[in-house]
Amino acid sequence: MANKFNESSTSSKPVSPVVSFMPPKPVVLVGLMGSGKTSIGKRLARRFDLPFCDSDQEVEEAAGCSIGDIDSVFGEGALQEGELKVISRLINQGIQVIATGCLSFTYEETRRYIKEHAISVWLKGDLETLLLRVTGKKDRPLLEIGKEEEILTKMIEDYYPLLEESDITVTTLDEPASITVDRVIIAISEFIRKTYPDYHILRSV
């Protein structure tokens, strides 16, 4: 992808940036469970002074049941359709920060819509980091307690090639969330400069 931005492409040491720009499109966070989409998304929205939405929460409210129940009762196709409807609606509401479900970006239609209408940021965690955050948690419908490593290993193998299609990749580490947010802001700023050269940004990074 010509305009793909990976934070590793810059050698500058992350420092706490003063946000003096607005993204030209909604910012959509993608990644597997445990990557920090919700926690980072909320902090990122505060730094940008933008609304924050969790698409999983919106899907559950629209359906009147949990993501796990939608999948088990109505099937994966119904879940994909519901996620596409909700995510497209959120994107069309205007510029905001959106945290998506762990597999949302792996669905072709949803991925295509996000890529056309938003800035996608992949919070990429390695297996060790993801396991540290999700092992033993009961609120992860796609994970079976005791088999987290096996399931996550397979998901990384299957889904990371699709997540690579995101506009921006930021590696999530075992570090304070505020530092990760700083790195996301810097990555978004650099991506905008590269991809939207006519878009005016007051640089304070």
What is the predicted function of each stretch?
Residues 54-115, 140:
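ATP-dependent small-molecule kinase phosphotransfer cores
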Residues 32:
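P-loop (Walker A) phosphate-binding loop of NTP-binding proteins
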Residues 2-22, 43, 47, 93, ...:
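NTP-dependent small-molecule kinase module
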Residues 38:
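Walker A/P-loop
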